[in-house]
C-alpha cells in the first residue's frame, strides 16, 4: 500500500506553492474603509476600488514562513500546549476511564444514544454561539469515550469537532459569520432565522445519521476502521487504566465535577464574558491542576504529567504554525485581493440560482486561503452584496451562501489551525482524516447548493 505523505510534507508543499503563486499572480489591493458593524468597528473593502500594485514574490520567505505562522497563530498554539498538558493530568488521575466505565454500565445497551445527543448539543453551540476553537479540547474526552464504547477515534472527533463545525456552517445566529455578514450587507440582524433553523436542522440530522451509520459498521467490525491499527494501542491503554481503576471513588467524582465546572465556565465565558483562546487556556490549566491535587498526585507528579501531555501534543502545535505560514506567504505576497477580485468577476456574470450557487463556490474556494470566517466576511460581503442586487438575488441569500461556503470546508482544509490542531489532539493523521471525511464534504456541498435554490427563487429576505 502506498504511504500517504506526512502532514508536515503537505503543509510545507503548500507553503512552496503559495510562494510560487506570488511570482505568477499580479499584486492587487482593494481600498479599505472603517464601518460600524453592531457594537464594533471593522475595516471592510470598498467595492470598485481594486487596483494593481507591485507584486512581492515570497520565494525567499519559504523557510521563515513557519516561524511567522507561529506568531500569527500564537494563541492557538499556546492553547494546544496548555490543553494537552492539562488534560493529560486529568487523564492520569484515572477519573476519565472510571467515569466512562460508569457511563457504559449505566447506559448498558443504550450507548448508541450518546452520539445523537452529544452531536446535537455541539451543533447547537456551533449554530447559536459560533463554537469552533472551543470544541478542540473535547476531542481529548470524546475520543477515549468512543473507543471505550467500541467505536473508533473518528467517531469521537465527529461527536465534537464535526458537530460543532456543522453547526458553525449552518448557523442560525452565529455571531462570527451570520451576524457580521448581515451587518456588512445591510440586512437586519438575525433576520431569516426561520429558514436558517430549517437548514441547520436538516444538515445536523444528515450528519448525525451519517456518523451513526458509520459507528454501527465499526462496532460490528472494528477492522473496517481506517484508524484500527492506531486505535489498538489507545484501546489497550484505556483497558489498562480501567483495570487499575475498577472502583469509582469520591476522588474520581470530584475530578469529574471539576471538569463539569470547567465546561460550564467555558460556556458562560464564551457567551457572556467574551472569553477566547487565552482565557480558555487558563481555565483548562486551572482544571488540570485542581484535578491533579484532588486526586492526591502531588505537585511534582502534576508538573511531570503536564509536561508529558504538552510534549505529546508538540506535533499539533508545530503543524498549526506551518498552516499559519501558508496564510502569511499569501498575505505578504499581496495576492489575496487579486484572487478575490478574479473570483468575484466570474460571479458577477451570473444571475438567479446560478449566481447564489456560484457565490457559495467562491466562498468555498476562498476558505482555503482565508480560513477565518469573520475575516472573509469583511473581505467578501462588501463586494458580493452589491452583486446580489445586480444578479437578482437578495442580500440575505448572499449571506447564506457565504456562511455555508465558509463553514463546511473548514473541517478539512490544511490551512485551518483548528482542523490540524484537532486532528493532532485526537492523534488522527491528517491524511487519514481527509480520506475518511471527503465524501461527507461532497454531501455538504450538495446540501448547500440545494439549500440556496429556494432563497434564490423566492426572493427570501
PLM feature spans:
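C-terminal transmembrane helix pair
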Residues: 5, 347-461
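Long, contiguous bundles of hydrophobic transmembrane helices that form the permeation core
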Residues: 2-4, 8, 33-41, 194-305, ...
Amino acid at each position: 500500500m502506498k504511504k500517504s505523505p506526512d502532514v508536515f510534507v503537505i503543509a510545507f508543499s503548500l507553503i512552496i506553492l503559495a510562494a510560487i503563486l506570488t511570482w505568477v499572480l499580479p499584486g492587487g489591493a482593494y481600498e479599505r474603509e472603517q464601518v460600524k458593524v453592531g457594537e464594533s468597528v471593522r475595516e471592510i473593502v470598498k467595492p470598485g476600488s481594486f487596483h494593481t500594485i507591485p507584486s512581492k514574490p515570497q520565494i525567499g520567505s519559504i523557510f521563515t514562513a513557519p516561524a511567522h505562522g507561529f506568531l500569527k497563530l500564537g494563541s492557538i498554539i499556546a492553547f494546544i500546549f496548555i490543553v494537552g498538558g492539562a488534560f493529560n493530568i486529568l487523564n492520569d488521575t484515572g477519573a476519565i476511564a472510571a467515569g466512562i466505565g460508569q457511563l457504559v454500565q449505566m447506559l448498558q445497551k443504550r450507548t448508541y444514544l450518546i452520539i445523537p445527543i452529544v452531536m446535537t448539543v455541539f451543533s447547537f453551540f456551533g449554530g447559536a454561539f459560533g463554537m469552533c476553537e472551543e470544541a478542540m479540547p473535547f476531542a481529548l474526552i470524546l475520543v477515549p469515550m468512543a473507543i471505550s464504547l467500541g467505536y473508533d477515534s473518528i467517531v469521537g472527533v465527529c461527536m465534537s469537532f464535526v458537530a460543532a463545525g456543522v453547526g458553525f456552517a449552518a448557523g442560525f445566529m452565529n455571531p462570527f459569520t451570520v451576524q457580521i455578514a448581515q451587518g456588512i450587507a445591510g440586512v437586519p440582524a438575525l433576520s431569516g432565522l426561520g429558514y436558517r433553523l430549517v437548514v441547520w436542522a436538516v444538515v445536523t440530522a444528515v450528519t448525525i445519521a451519517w456518523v451513526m451509520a458509520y459507528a454501527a459498521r465499526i462496532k460490528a467490525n472494528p477492522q473496517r476502521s481506517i484508524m484500527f491499527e492506531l486505535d489498538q494501542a489507545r484501546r489497550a491503554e484505556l483497558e489498562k487504566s480501567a483495570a487499575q481503576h475498577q472502583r469509582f471513588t469520591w476522588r474520581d467524582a470530584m475530578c469529574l465535577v471539576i471538569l463539569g465546572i470547567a465546561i460550564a465556565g467555558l460556556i458562560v465565558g464564551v457567551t457572556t464574558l467574551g472569553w477566547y483562546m487565552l482565557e480558555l487556556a487558563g481555565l483548562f490549566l486551572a482544571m488540570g491542576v485542581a484535578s491533579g491535587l484532588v486526586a492526591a498526585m502531588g505537585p511534582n507528579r502534576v508538573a511531570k504529567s503536564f509536561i508529558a501531555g504538552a510534549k505529546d501534543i508538540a506535533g499539533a502545535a508545530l503543524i498549526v504554525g506551518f498552516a499559519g505560514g501558508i496564510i502569511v506567504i499569501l498575505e505578504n505576497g499581496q495576492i489575496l485581493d487579486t484572487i478575490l477580485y478574479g473570483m468575484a468577476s466570474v460571479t458577477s456574470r451570473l444571475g438567479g440560482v446560478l449566481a447564489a450557487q456560484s457565490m457559495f463556490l467562491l466562498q468555498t474556494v476562498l476558505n482555503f486561503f482565508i480560513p477565518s470566517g469573520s475575516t472573509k466576511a469583511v473581505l467578501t460581503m462588501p463586494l458580493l452584496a452589491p452583486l446580489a442586487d445586480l444578479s437578482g438575488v437578495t442580500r440575505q441569500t448572499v449571506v447564506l451562501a457565504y456562511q455555508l461556503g465558509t463553514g463546511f470546508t473548514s473541517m478539512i482544509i490544511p490551512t485551518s489551525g483548528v482542523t490540524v490542531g484537532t486532528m493532532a489532539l485526537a492523534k488522527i493523521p491528517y491524511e487519514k482524516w481527509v480520506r475518511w471525511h471527503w465524501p461527507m464534504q461532497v454531501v455538504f456541498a450538495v446540501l448547500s447548493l440545494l439549500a440556496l435554490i429556494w432563497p434564490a427563487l423566492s426572493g427570501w429576505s
